[in-house]
């Protein structure tokens, strides 16, 4: 039901450069913002029955992701530290990357993080604009890239950060999730059903919340 494997970060193939009749802009999206974008998830581990959530979800340590038919998980490892740095959730041709990080107790991180994301995109020759999305203000990005075959291409994405209690979950929607409202909606629900397990240890803002491969089910006793 789920396929789990390790990959490097941002290892999704870009789309080929569109013709003049095509658009490279992300589509608009399934729903605007609520007064509380997190009222329907993702959840903090203190807000739910943690034991039941672990039974219903794939346990990656810092993230619990609900099982969905056809869902694939690709653990992404930071090349410098060798530690898991995020997870790519793939459904058909759509994907969402999720990266959980620690945040201050008194304030969230997304307001300042999205400014840096937009600046980085523009520095790389791409475009970035803010828009309303299901998790609040998001950043819609289009980056110029080169395929392994040497062709010019673009990679559109939608980046949303969700501030929780002492954590932020950064989500980047890719592939069909950018161009198909239906595919986007399916992955939005995956994000909403996710549980963040930060832990109680002190952590500086921006530090990655530890992830790990899922544990194999224990063999039943004879």
Task: Indicate residue ranges for each PLM-predicted region.
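N-terminal intrinsically disordered, low-complexity tails
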Residues: 7-45
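Surface-exposed amphipathic alpha-helical segments
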Residues: 71, 172-221
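Long, low-complexity intrinsically disordered regions
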Residues: 1-2, 8, 15-16, 24, ...
């Amino acid at each position: 039901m789920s396929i789990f494997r390790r990959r490097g970060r941002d290892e999704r193939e870009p789309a080929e450069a569109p013709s003049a009749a095509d658009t490279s802009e992300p589509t608009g999206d399934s729903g605007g913002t609520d007064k509380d974008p997190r009222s329907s998830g993702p959840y903090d581990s203190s807000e739910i029955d943690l034991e039941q959530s672990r039974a219903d979800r794939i346990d990656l340590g810092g993230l619990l992701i609900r099982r969905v038919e056809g869902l694939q998980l690709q653990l992404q490892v930071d090349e410098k530290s060798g530690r898991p740095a995020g997870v790519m959730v793939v459904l058909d041709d759509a994907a969402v990357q999720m990266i959980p990080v620690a945040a201050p107790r008194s304030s969230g991180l997304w307001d300042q993080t999205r400014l840096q994301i937009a600046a980085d995109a523009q520095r790389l020759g791409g475009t970035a604009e803010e828009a309303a999305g299901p998790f609040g203000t998001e950043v819609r990005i289009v980056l110029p890239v080169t395929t392994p075959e040497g062709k010019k291409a673009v990679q559109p994405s939608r980046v949303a950060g969700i501030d929780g209690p002492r954590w932020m979950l950064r989500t980047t929607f890719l592939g069909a999730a950018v161009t198909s409202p239906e595919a986007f909606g399916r992955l939005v629900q995956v994000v909403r059903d996710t549980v963040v397990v930060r832990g109680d240890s002190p952590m500086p803002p921006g530090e990655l919340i530890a992830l790990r491969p899922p544990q194999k089910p224990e063999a039943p006793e004879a």
